Amino acid sequence: MTSPGAPRQLRPTDIKRLNRSWRRLTQARLALLLDSVGQPFNVGSIIRTAAALGVGRIWLCGNCASPDHPSARKTALGTERLVSCESEPSAAAAAAAAAADGLRVIAIELTDGAIPLHEAPLSGDVCLALGNEDHGCSAALLAAADVIAYIPQTGRVGSLNVAAAAAIALAEARRREWSDG
């Protein structure tokens, strides 16, 4: 039993109202490019996060797991119907498609010359690009990217799960839009 004035979880109608208010503050288009993300549960998790943060399109390229794989669909929990997923034969082709659509391509990767994500130019229409679980973004994707950014980490682990990295990058892009707008 909760005491009067204690926080309570929102009801579904309250959540819908809250989400509508955030959607009104959202102008920029946000997309993803997945370069050979091979594990179906990672693809499904990324799709679910993408749907939650208003991503309009996901380009899948290279040896990327299919969003139709049973494990991807199970992890996505039906949200795959809310995000357009398109296949491209290569990361370079996917990056070119994103650029042709007016999106700035920002690869999330640890490289020489990469900038911290919180300093990356995330304003406007952006396509965040993430790579394979073991090898990261391909050389072709890094060459095609407008910017390469990394997620600063202070712990003793050298990398993040690709689905976690996607969630952090997407949330930072939206947070920046909402706080700068």
Model-assigned labels for residue ranges:
Residues 1-181:
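Post-transcriptional modification and biogenesis factors for structured RNAs
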